[in-house]
Amino acid sequence: MHFQVILMMMWLWLEAEGGTCPTLYKRYSKHHTYCLHPNSTCKILTRGVSSGDKEIILREHNKLRSRVATGKETKYSLPKASDMMQLVWDDELASVAQKHADQCVFEHDCNDCRNVQNFGVGQNLHLRTSSAKFSDITWAGAVNGWYDEVKDFNKRQISGFIDGKGPPQTGHFTQAVWATSWRVGCGRSMFKDGNTFKDLYTCNYGPGGNMKNAIIYTKGKPCSGCPLNSCCGKACGGISYDGLCKMSGNTAPQYSPPKGFAFRCTFNGESDCATTTSGAKKWKTIKTLSGSFIGIVLNPGESSTLSFTVPFGVSDGSMCVESYYRKGPQVAGQVAAGNAVEKFGDPADPSFDYSTPLKESTDFMQFGVTLGWNTKTTLSVVFSVPPGTAPQYLEMKDISVRKGEC
């Protein structure tokens, strides 16, 4: 393999960069929240989250998530969860959340404005107001207030999230108990707005929840759907909670691979991931807290081809080739000019060539193509950037082949 492997430790890099706006954040949004200065029109009196606050935030979230997972939310008859993760603290999410709280605005920032490389990010907000300065901090009240939306929650959404905006509003509750969210980081600012004191609480979650049609949690025996590299409840030792899957260390959750694929590469060392490159040899495998992907950044006038050396095929009929990718300009707002193509070849016939282009998408997008043959086939990805444009990126993950149509 002719590409570099990078373990993503974004927060350490951010600390080294100090107050600058990281390149990746510039890619996600022209107005990434981390890159904003505090709002100069409001007078911030206190800000930040203490170590004691962190303990309260984690305790309150996990106590409530455990209540759902173990079937103890009997008042509203919620079923048990088999895959509810235990939340742990994330400094990068907290850093971005604090920058949001420093804006003194009780409104969500845009999804791209809070994204980090490890995952897409969800968000919950809480605001309290008073004519007098607050003398206490109410993280427990904020978290429990989000959870209290359970009273209006429609259980049918557990198997397919539809909408949390309401009325009545339930999106804070669904994000707080979204099973696959397992990292959280929060920020707080108390400020004066005219004659009113305001206290703004922001929590960011990764991977983010409230995805339309996605499962909020899987119904079943608690912990029966935990990641392979996690432990469950009291068996974990330390601070743990009944019915919650607990991760340790900075590694992505791993699950048993699904069966029935003729080819699958998730860029985690599988034999199907063997590749060669031609042109610009800049492909890098990035390991994040939500899995691995391969990516490249090309300057204007450059091109590169990534070729998978393991051919694939099925016994008869057609086959479906699926992949997830995202591509666009290295700086948000610049013109998207990268040309990406998936090329399919026949090892026995070098003259055979079938290609299909990849459209623009700044979020990972599922792409499937049905091949109307079953003979051995190879896959290459060709990426190029025309001269006179701006640098462009392409990232791909989870490439698979199965029998039948897409």
UniProtKB/Swiss-Prot annotation:
Cellular component, GO, one term = extracellular region
Tissue pattern of expression reads: Expressed by the venom gland.
- Disulfide connectivity? none
User: What InterPro entries does UniProt report for this protein, alphabetically?
Assistant: Allrgn_V5/Tpx1_CS, CAP_dom, CAP_sf, CRISP-related, V5_allergen-like
Where is this chain glycosylated? N39
Q: Which UniProt keywords apply?
A: Disulfide bond, Glycoprotein, Secreted, Signal
Q: Mainly resides where? A: secreted
Q: Where is it located?
A: Secreted
Q: Where is the SCP domain?
A: 58-205
Known post-translational modifications?
Contains 9 disulfide bonds.
Q: Which residues form the signal peptide?
A: 1-18
| Gene3D superfamilies given in the database record | CAP
Q: Which SUPFAM superfamilies match?
A: PR-1-like (SSF55797)
PROSITE patterns referenced in this protein's UniProt entry, alphabetically:
CRISP_2
Question: What transmembrane ranges does the database entry give?
Answer: none
- What family is reported? Belongs to the CRISP family.
Q: Which PANTHER family match?
A: CYSTEINE-RICH SECRETORY PROTEIN-RELATED (PTHR10334)
For this entry, the protein name equals CRISP/Allergen/PR-1
Q: Which organism is it from?
A: Trittame loki (Brush-footed trapdoor spider)
